[in-house]
Design a protein with these regions (language model features):
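C-terminal "cap" of GNAT-fold acetyltransferases
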Residues: 3, 134, 141-148, 154-157, ...
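Extreme N-terminal starter segment of soluble prokaryotic enzymes
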Residues: 7-10
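Residue-level signal for alpha-helix termini/capping positions
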Residues: 71, 129-130
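Residues within well-ordered beta-strands of beta-sheet-rich folds
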Residues: 81, 137-139
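Conserved acetyl-CoA-binding loop-helix of GNAT-fold acetyltransferases
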Residues: 107, 113-126, 149-153
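Short coil/turn segments at alpha/beta junctions that flank glycine-rich nucleotide-binding fingerprints
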Residues: 114, 130-134
Length: 183
């Protein structure tokens, strides 16, 4: 694992010449447990269950019209670079509910745990505050415990659960909705 300081990282908005870098951050990640949500007295809480064996999962590369994320008022994609290598990204949109919705956040495997995700979230938060949005939201599958732990560490709270959205996937029991409200 490399060591990275914030001074070494450049966060760049998407430009046409950077489109080829978008999928470079889509590495596999470990699925080692799941979040089990509970709703009581109007509040969400959760427990963690660890799996006996971890497995590697990789999402397919998104096939989008990336030009739409360049110089747009209501969506953006930011790429994180170290020594001209793309090591992370965050893709965001202004949602109907006045939240900045994170469509995707990813850090290359070798750079996880070094603050890249935090830097990208800070960039998204700045973008959202410039637009006077209420906060940031995202969704994660219940079996992506590593990501859910990261979101909690970054100040997100569980705001909802959908048990039908991923019905086609027998591995996923629930989609979890996470929120970070601005004060």
């Amino acid at each position: 694992m490399n060591s990275t300081s914030a001074e070494e990282i450049i966060i760049s908005p998407l430009k046409e010449e950077l489109i080829e870098d978008i999928h470079k951050t889509n590495d596999s990640f470990k699925v080692f447990g799941k979040v089990v949500p509970s709703f009581q007295s109007g509040k969400w809480s959760f427990e963690e269950i660890l799996f006996d064996e971890a497995k590697d999962v990789r999402f397919p590369d998104d096939q989008l019209d990336w030009i739409e994320y360049i110089d747009s008022e209501d969506k953006a994609l930011f790429l994180a670079y170290k020594n001209n290598d793309c090591i992370g990204q965050i893709r965001i949109v202004q949602d109907w509910n006045r939240f900045c919705y994170i469509e995707n956040i990813a850090t290359k495997e070798d750079f996880r745990g070094q603050g890249i995700g935090s830097l990208l979230l800070t960039k998204a938060e700045d973008w959202a505050k410039e637009r006077n949005l209420l906060g940031i939201s995202l969704e994660a599958q219940d079996d992506n415990l590593g990501a859910c732990r990261f979101y909690v560490k970054q100040g997100f709270v569980l705001g909802g659960v959908d048990t039908l959205k991923q019905s086609y996937n027998p591995q996923i029991d629930a989609t979890l909705y996470w929120y970070k409200l601005f004060k």
